[in-house]
């Protein structure tokens, strides 16, 4: 069993979770961050990394991946510990200001406060419902792409009709031997520009598109070799492949959060807007996972919540009645924590 000790455990490494690291770091508090996904960024990284976001202050037009990169650059100063591809199963309140957070890998984090920044909950891929197909998972069947070189010079079949399926098909066709995109219809839930580009590449014979659904698979010597695709009119067609990428989207699930004895409102965690503390003292919730009257599910709202939560947590952990507001432009204490040096004379010159 792996054991870690920190001031605050943050559940969720999406944009709000990353900003929570920074805000707690400004207060001099250490963090361990747990996320069920294998990389930081939450939905921004997993679902729409190349899509533009227009409502982040001072970033009028930035890709989701760029927002995450900037947030990480800001948070990395405080050297957080990450536990990725780990799902929190249990939170035990040992005493008023002491918790043990346990993951499904039996990692234990001893901390003095917990922040739930889990977005819509833990994400898991929507899987291909075909008996016995799962035996090829992570060898020839993939629900996410982490190493594009694995597909170089291979015959790749991509299933799906959303942004991820279109974007990866367009990317893979540059290096794969062949790419065949399969979707149940010609109605896509993806950017029109991506759909148009896909059809353009099909006309240029650089990739293919086929309407239909997978009805069975073929294998030889324990290797996946092909799929049978059934069209709407019942016609079967067999396609050969080396690799299969299934991008049906991600399914958010609250999972164990439902069992943590927190007061809920329609699958969201109720919080006090003064501190963003939940119904359990010492456990906080920020971002899309929380609820209060007037709640808006916006990244910038989550940033505001993370800042206020950090002050409240610091007052609890440091046992102070009220933490003063220290400005990053002028506070020597904050400058020391940020690892920057500024003198009053330099700022006034």
Swiss-Prot record:
Pfam families: Pyr_redox_2. Binds 1 FAD per subunit. FAD binds at residues 35, 43, 48, 88, 123, 288, 329. Keywords: FAD, Flavoprotein, NADP, Oxidoreductase. It is an enzyme of class 1 (oxidoreductase). One of its GO terms (molecular function) is flavin adenine dinucleotide binding. It comes from the Bacteria. Its EC number is 1.18.1.2. It catalyses: 2 reduced [2Fe-2S]-[ferredoxin] + NADP(+) + H(+) = 2 oxidized [2Fe-2S]-[ferredoxin] + NADPH. Its cofactor is FAD. Homodimer. Belongs to the ferredoxin--NADP reductase type 2 family. This is Ferredoxin--NADP reductase. It comes from Colwellia psychrerythraea (strain 34H / ATCC BAA-681). The lineage of its organism: Bacteria, Pseudomonadati, Pseudomonadota, Gammaproteobacteria, Alteromonadales.
């Amino acid at each position: 069993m792996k054991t870690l000790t920190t001031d605050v455990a943050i559940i969720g490494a999406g944009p709000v979770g990353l900003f929570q690291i920074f805000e707690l770091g400004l207060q001099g508090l250490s963090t361990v961050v747990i996320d069920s996904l294998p990389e930081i960024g939450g939905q921004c990284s997993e679902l729409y990394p190349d899509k533009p976001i227009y409502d982040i202050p001072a970033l009028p037009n930035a890709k989701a991946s760029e927002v995450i990169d900037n947030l990480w650059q800001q948070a990395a100063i405080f050297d957080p510990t990450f536990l990725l591809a780990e799902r929190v199963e249990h939170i035990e309140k040992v005493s008023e200001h002491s918790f043990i957070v346990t993951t499904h890998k039996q990692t234990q984090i001893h901390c003095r406060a917990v922040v739930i920044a889990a977005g819509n909950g833990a994400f898991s891929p929507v899987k291909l419902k075909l008996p016995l197909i799962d035996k090829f998972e992570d060898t020839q069947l993939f629900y996410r792409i982490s190493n594009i070189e694995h597909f170089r010079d291979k015959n790749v079949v991509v299933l799906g009709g959303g942004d991820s399926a279109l974007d990866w098909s367009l990317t893979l066709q540059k290096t794969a031997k062949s790419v065949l995109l399969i979707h149940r219809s010609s109605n896509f839930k993806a950017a029109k520009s991506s759909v148009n580009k896909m059809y353009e590449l099909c006309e240029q014979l650089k990739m293919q598109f086929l309407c239909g659904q997978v009805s069975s698979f073929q294998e030889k010597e324990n290797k996946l070799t092909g799929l049978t695709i059934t069209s709407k009119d019942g016609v079967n067609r067999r396609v050969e492949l080396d690799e299969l990428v299934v991008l049906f989207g991600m399914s958010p699930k609250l999972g164990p959060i439902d069992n943590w004895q927190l007061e809920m409102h329609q699958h969201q965690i109720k919080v006090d807007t003064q501190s963003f503390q939940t119904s359990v003292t010492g456990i906080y919730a920020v971002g899309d996972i929380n609820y209060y009257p007037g709640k808006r599910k916006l990244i910038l709202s989550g940033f505001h919540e993370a800042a206020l939560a950090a002050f409240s947590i610091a007052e609890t952990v440091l046992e102070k009645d009220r933490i003063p507001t220290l400005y990053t432009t002028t506070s020597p204490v904050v400058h020391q924590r940020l690892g920057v040096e500024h003198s009053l004379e330099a700022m006034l010159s």
